[in-house]
From Swiss-Prot:
GTP binds at residues 71-78, 136-140, 190-193. This is Translation factor GUF1 homolog, mitochondrial. GO terms for biological process: positive regulation of translation; translation. PANTHER family: TRANSLATION FACTOR GUF1, MITOCHONDRIAL, TRANSLATION FACTOR GUF1-RELATED. Its EC number is 3.6.5.-. Belongs to the TRAFAC class translation factor GTPase superfamily. Classic translation factor GTPase family. LepA subfamily. The lineage of its organism: Eukaryota, Metazoa, Placozoa, Uniplacotomia, Trichoplacea.
Amino acid sequence: MTLNLRCKVVEPSWKVLQHYASYVRNTAAVSLVRHHARLSTSTNLTSKAAEPITALSEFPVEKIRNFSIIAHIDHGKSTLADRLLEIAGVIPKSAENKQVLDKLQVERERGITVKAQTASMLYEYHGETYLLNLIDTPGHVDFNYEVSRSLAACQGVLLVVDASQGVQAQTVANFFLAFEADLKIIPVLNKIDMKSANPDRIANQLQRVFDIEPEETMKVSAKDGTGIDQLLPTIIEKIPPPTCDQQKPLKALLFDSWYDRYRGVIGLLAIKDGKLTKGEKIQSAFSKKQYEILDLGILYPNEKSTKTLGSGQVGFIVAGMKSTKEAQIGDTFCHVNCPVDALPGFKPAKSMVYAGLFPFNKSEFEVLRSAIHKLTLNDSSVSVHNDNSAALGPGFRLGFLGLLHMDVFNQRLEQEYDVSVVITSPNVPFKGKYRYASILRKEHEEMVITTPSQFPDIAQVVEYLEPVVMGTIIFPDKYMGKMLNLCQSKRGQQVNISYIDETRVMLKYILPLHEIVIDFYDQLKSLTSGYASFDYEDHGYRSATLAKMEILLNGTPVDALTTVVHEEKARITGKQVCQKLKEAIPRQLYEVAIQATIRGKVVARETIRAVRKDVTAKCYGGDITRKLKLLKRQKEGKSRLKMIGKIEVPKEAFLAVLKR
C-alpha cells in the first residue's frame, strides 16, 4: 500500500523534470499533484523526498536560482532555512525540524552553523517549476572563509537581521562580502513575533548603514511562519538566474568539500558552463590530475543521485579523490582534453591563531595523530605541524581561523574521536625583518614567527612586526566611554566612529590580533552587559616593540614557559605568570625564586618560601648559643641544597600557565 501511495503522489512530479516539454502541456494536472503532495501526510512527504531525481540536465537555466542566507550569529538563519525547505515540500512540516542543515553535533549543541551546507528545492510559481539551490552559511566571524566560498556559487542573498537586536558587526561584514561579489541582496527582518521587536527602527538602521529603502525590507518570523510564504516568490522575482551556456565546454567551480571514509572526498560544484555526466572524466586546472565521475547529484537535503548536472546547477560529485588536499577550494574542473580558462579562485584560508595540542598521556600520541588527521580531512583550513614540549612531551602545533574555530575543533576531537587534549594558550604569527643577508636568506627578508623558539635576537633584526585587524564594534551609545577605554588599553588605533541610529554606535579600530585572541570578547560583553557585537578582518602587519620573555626558576630558564610579549605589557604579563607558578609549584626545602626576564633584565619576581623545620624544638633551655649553632647549620645545609637541588615543576604548574 505504501508503494502504491508513493507512485500515485510522487511519480508525476519527477516526470515533470524528465520531460519538461510535456510538463508545459499538463500544467494543471501537475499543479494538482504538487498541491496534493504538500498537503499529504509526513509518510508521503518522506517518500517524495527519497525519490531519485534523474533528469536535471533538461532543466532550463532561466528556471534556476542560486541563493544564500547570510546573517549575524543567532539571528535565526538556520530556522529560516528549515521553514523554506518545509514550504518547498523538501522536508515534512514538523516541530522536530530544528537546524536540519546543521549536521555536526557541535552545531546542534551550540546552536551555530560551522560548516556551509547546500539544499536544493523544487517550487512551483505561476505555473512554472523552479529549481532553487539554498546554500546555508555560518554566522560567526571565524567562519567568514566559509561564507565567501558559498557566495561564489550564488547570484543573490537573503540578508537576515534580528528585528529586536538590529544591525550587528557580522551583519556589516556579510553585507560587504555580498556587495563586493555583486550579488542581489534581499533584506529580511526576522523574529518580528518577539515582544521586543521593532521592525520600523531596524529598517531605518538598514537604510542608514546600507542605503536600503525600508519598503524593500521583508518582515518575517521563521519561528511561527509569518511572512515566510512570500520569500520564495520574492527570490524567484528578484534574484537573477545564473549566467551560463550549456553548449560551451564544461567549466565547474569547486567551492566546498568533505571526506567520507567509504567514498573518499565529496566535492560541491557550481556548474558555470556545459554539463557533467556520470562516468565522464574531468581534469583539475590546479593540479592537472584526472578523475572519473563515480557519482553525482544534488542535495535534497540529503544526497540524491542524478545522471547529469547542467549549467547553472549546484551539486555534489564523487570522483575517487583520497584527500581534501586534492580538492583545492576554488579549483576549476573541465573535461579531459578540453581545457578552459580557470575561474577566479579564492584566497587560501590564513591561520590567525596558533595553539599547541598535546595528549594528556604521552602514550596516546598516536591516537591523537590519527584523530587530527581524520578531522582535518573535513577541515582543510586547519594547518598542522609537529611540536615538542619539554613539559608536555610530543604534540602538534595547529593554526586556526580564530578562537571559536579552535574551540569547535577541540570539541569535535572529544565528541567524534573520544580524544582529550591539553590546549596551550593561543598566540599569533609575528614577523621579524632580518638586518643582514646570509646563505639562507636575503637582507631585510621577513620570517614568520609562530613559536617563541623561532624568535630572533634584537641584534639580528631591523624591526619586529605584529598582525593587526580592522575591528568593528556595535554597541549602545551609553557604553561609549568604556569601549574607548577598552580599545585604548589594547593598543588600538581609532579609524572611525558613527551612529547607525539614535542610540547605537559603530566603532572601527585597528587592533593588534595578539590583544584580542585571549579575553577581548569576554571583556567586551562584560562591559556592555552583553549588548555589544564584534567582528574583525585581517589588516596586515605593523611595526611593534616585541620581546621574548623567559621564566627562570632559581636562575635556570624553563624553555616550555618562554613566550613572546609586547614590551608595554611585559611587566603585567610576567607578574601574572609568576603568580600562577607560585600557586602551582609546591614548597621546597629551600627558597625558590621565580623570575620573568626580558633580555636579561628581571621584570617580575615571586618567591616561594622554604619549608622550615624547627631544629630548636629539642632545646629546652641552656645556652642560647646552642640554638644559634643549630640554626646556622640548617642555613648552611639549605644553601648547599639550593646549589645542587633540582626543582621538579609538576605538570599541573605548566598547565596553569600554558592552558587557556
